[in-house]
From Swiss-Prot:
Molecular functions (GO terms): rRNA (cytosine-N4-)-methyltransferase activity
Family: Belongs to the methyltransferase superfamily. RsmH family.
Protein name listed in UniProt: Ribosomal RNA small subunit methyltransferase H
Listed GO biological process terms: rRNA base methylation
Keyword Methyltransferase: yes
Organism lineage: Bacteria, Pseudomonadati, Pseudomonadota, Alphaproteobacteria, Hyphomicrobiales
Amino acid sequence: MSRAPRTARAELPKGEQARHVPVLLAEVLAALSLDRPGLAVDGTFGAGGYTRALLEAGPEVRVIAIDRDPTAIRGGADLVTASGGRLRLVQGRFGDLDTLIADQDEAQADWIVLDIGVSSMQIDEAQRGFSFRQDGPLDMRMGGEGPSAADLVNGEEETTLADILYHFGEERRSRAVARAIVEARRRAPIETTAQLADLVAGVVRPEPGSPIHPATRSFQGLRIAVNDELGELVRGLHAAERVLKPGGRLAVVTFHSLEDRIVKQFFSARSGRAAQASRHVPGVERPAPKSFKLVTKGPVLPSEAETDVNPRSRSAKLRAGERTDAPAPPPLSAIEMLASLPAPQGRGPRR
């Protein structure tokens, strides 16, 4: 594990809001090593911070930027105009990036960056329903399609809700929270973020001195389930593996342990290291051809200077790898299992 030098982020624009500051930007650019003409793919466009930096890396760098959120795509129109034809914005999921770039008549990419999870823009907009700090409709959908968080909260069985909160939110009181949700929805639907946050806070007591809101883990679990975030990450890693040229590089920024575990196991297995065991994986998979070599030997963490400017960067971790000329192996089932809820095996210990 390495932390970026304190001086590495001194140039961060203090006048901008944190939502416009891409996390670990200097470290991502160093890991990608954009030293030649080529195609870069930003799989998570958001506010365009990484895309802008990719364009500025060199006049012969072309960029395809992907986002499932139509609001983000609309917000990037000016950047497309300013790019002089070097930027294409594509609405879609980065788990389909191989298909999406093929639709743009591109077969392979030289660099890919993935910034995993919800964007600051989505969190800060109350109407998107991601945050317990602002009251809004209980939505949480990144792309606006599919069941919302309210649909899950008001429609799923108690055991399924408990599993979502426990495995995706790492909420130790998951069964108690799920029970409280079911009891509350019998009286009236749970429709707003404030309703849910207050409900969870009545069950989960904050740890003394901790700044973490009691509803943090429950909101994380629901958001991951609504958007299939871990499944999307797994598909994105495999898609990147298929389209990167030999010598091409993949940089992935994660923000919590569930994401980082998947990325770590992917690079570990694909670089020839032994896959890591987990509670979901009964055994270790047979070694596959080495399709990546590690660029970062462990997670790269933000510097103190960056966390001073952007407190949301504190939990960020960067891992990166360089594609070899080995053919892409079949998808790694160990990380696919990490991305889904385990099959029911009895009630187990009380949570």
